[in-house]
Amino acid sequence: MGEPARWQRRVEEFVLGQIGDSPTRVLEVGCGEGELALALARAGHSVTAIDPRAPEGPIFRRARIEEFTDPGQFDHVVASLSLHHVEDLSMALDNIADLLRPGGTLIVVEFAWDRIDEAMAEWALDRLPAASPSEKPSWLGRCCRGWTRGGEGGSHYHGDDAEAHFAGWAGEEGLHNSRQVRAELERHLVERHFEWVPYLYPDLGDGVSESDESAAIESGTINATGFRYVGTRRALAEP
């Protein structure tokens, strides 16, 4: 199993661990190609998966979370790498809170691009697989190689600082940063679980594992750029 597949398996394990074994009603926001939604359905849950480009299939609907409606409420809402993409984050979380039953949970897996500093970018750059003309480079490869130019003797020349470079990329992509995402989560829900986790290793070379990135995080060499969050819907009387 390659690292991208292992990362997806970790996400599935985390989400299923939060949901439990009893069949529940689950909404996935930003389902992409549908791997996680299908895994949840195979586990016995009643799944509705939305995305503006959702695939065909009975559990999938092409919709944006800001406008999505449903006649019922959900036991769980799952958002894996989708909240930083939504156009109106506050509106999206307003709707998610309304779609959750009282006591229902929002389960989030997210990317904190704003925690990529120079040390993080250098660490990733040194571990990127060699560029191949026959393969489309990953987002990380494009960003890191766009930040640096080869210098004499194999040295690197950086046109700007890493934070500014990645902020420029995120601005072009319309991405929210992790501080914005966490602030809106705090405003709409009650936090039950939060942890920083490795995120970059699936896009690095074959020899770089989750444990390698974890060790670099634990030693203070690099920042963690992934996080997991679980929150419950606020009671109507709560501020």
Region locations from a protein language model:
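Conserved class I S-adenosyl-L-methionine
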Residues: 24-32, 107-142, 150
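Substrate-binding/catalytic lobe of Class I Rossmann-like enzymes that use SAM or dcSAM, i.e.
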Residues: 137-207
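A conserved beta-strand element that flanks and buttresses the S-adenosyl-L-methionine
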Residues: 78
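Conserved alpha-helix/loop element of class I SAM-dependent methyltransferases that forms part
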Residues: 5-22
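Class I SAM-dependent methyltransferase SAM/SAH-binding core
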Residues: 32-67
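C-terminal lobe and adjacent flexible extensions of AdoMet/dcAdoMet transferase-like proteins
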Residues: 188-239
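A short glycine-rich, Lys/Arg-flanked "PGG" loop and its adjoining helix->strand segment in the class I
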Residues: 91-102
